[in-house]
Design a protein with these regions (language model features):
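Short, charge-rich amphipathic alpha-helices with coiled-coil/heptad character
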Residues: 58-89
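Short E/K-rich amphipathic alpha-helical oligomerization segments
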Residues: 107-135
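N-terminal Sec/ER secretory leader and immediately downstream segment
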Residues: 1-66
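Heptad-repeat alpha-helical rod positions in long coiled-coil/spectrin-like domains
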Residues: 85, 89-92, 96, 103, ...
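Alpha-helical oligomerization segments
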Residues: 124-176
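A composition-driven signal for long, intrinsically disordered, charge-rich low-complexity tracts
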Residues: 9-11, 15-16, 20, 88, ...
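Non-transmembrane amphipathic alpha-helical segments
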Residues: 80, 87, 94, 98-116
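Generic alpha-helical secondary structure signal
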Residues: 30, 47, 51, 67, ...
Length: 176
């Protein structure tokens, strides 16, 4: 079980120097903006993302290294924190829907029990409603399993952001 932290702070993932105000303009730099999009994508293996960051740093003239790399950190943070917040919002909606489904299942089960208790109950109707209840319960249980997996996604995004920020920090330290 993880505690809900709606937004990250830069200090949680960046242990380098304070980012200059100009780093906030990362979206206006096409090369930084494109790299942020690439490395933030979870489908790209972390090692490949780290290599892209290293290659980017190696391609920069010395005087552009620090400004561009701090823009990259700010961009990764802004992009991945927004993605993480979006996922958390989706998890919240999903969990709320699960609560509604659970209440509906309890009502459906109670109705089936009442129908079974009637001595003159139509057995075909009892069987049909029992099948519906079993199917709805199976769907509910599969959604519970999915919710468990989906709840890991914000942590996966955080860990990726930390690893990528650490790569930038190490790259900057190596160039000094």
């Amino acid at each position: 079980v993880q505690r809900k932290v709606p937004q990250l702070s830069l200090g949680q993932v960046w242990n380098g120097p304070e980012l200059p105000p100009a780093a906030k303009d990362w979206a206006e730099d096409p090369s930084v903006s494109a790299l942020v999009e690439e490395v933030a994508a979870r489908r790209l293996q972390i090692a490949d993302a780290q290599k892209k960051i290293s290659d980017f740093a190696a391609s920069l003239p010395a005087e552009q290294l620090a400004p561009k790399m701090t823009m990259l950190v700010q961009g990764m943070f802004d992009h991945m924190d927004a993605e993480r917040s979006h996922v958390i919002s989706g998890i919240s909606r999903y969990a709320h829907k699960q609560l509604e489904m659970a209440a509906a299942l309890r009502k459906q089960a109670s109705d089936v029990d009442q129908l079974r208790a009637k001595p003159d109950a139509d057995q075909d109707e009892v069987e049909r409603r029992t099948d519906q209840l079993n199917f709805a319960t199976r769907i509910f249980n599969e959604r519970v399993q999915s919710l468990t997996y989906v709840c890991d996604v914000p942590t996966i995004i955080e860990q990726r952001l930390y690893q990528l920020s650490k790569t930038v920090s190490e790259t900057l330290a190596a160039k000094k």
